[in-house]
Amino acid sequence: CQYVPHKKLSIKDLDPDFYVFSAHKLYGPSGLGILYMKSKWIDKLEPYQGGGSMIKNVDTDSSTYLNGFQKFEAGTPPIAEVIGLSSSLDFINEVGIDKIYEYEKKLTQYLYDKLIKNNDIKIYGDFSNQTSIISFNIDGIHFNDLSMLLDKKNIAIRTGHHCAQPFMKHFNISGNARVSVGIYNTKDDIDYFINSIDEVKKILKS
């Protein structure tokens, strides 16, 4: 889900059985998800819900479904959301995914260089493989308190276990703060973020 808006992806080279991502992570509308599935799994898996446009025949004791992906598309599709996603993909293609990647890579490096200057900030993961996202904690400050005070400065980050509890257990922590950059961010945004962290530390560590 996190990879798609930041870097070019080749399903042919990756060759996954399944691949998923969300429209809102591509600057599109919320409430829409995309699932790529190899044909062998489409044939093997049963629909998880019923509805119109996916049924061949319904009887009192059985049902038969349409073939292929259609058996998973029950009911009225999210038409407006699909149109919105199409527009966001047009936007990304117009800008160029390679340009987006290079811009975000430089911006993330700038953010990383600023963060590691703080001895009380712990960064998680291998930064050499990072794209756009940095997870961290500040010694002596709970990540939720950090998020709450940054919110008052109109800075939105995510905190908690990020639906990745095994990752948190590996580092023996309950959660962390996660900051991400996008094509709409600038170095001025990064500077404001770092300055705001300094202000939060003064408040919570005083």
Please report, for each region that a protein language model flagged, where it lies by residue:
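Pyridoxal 5′-phosphate
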Residues: C1-S206
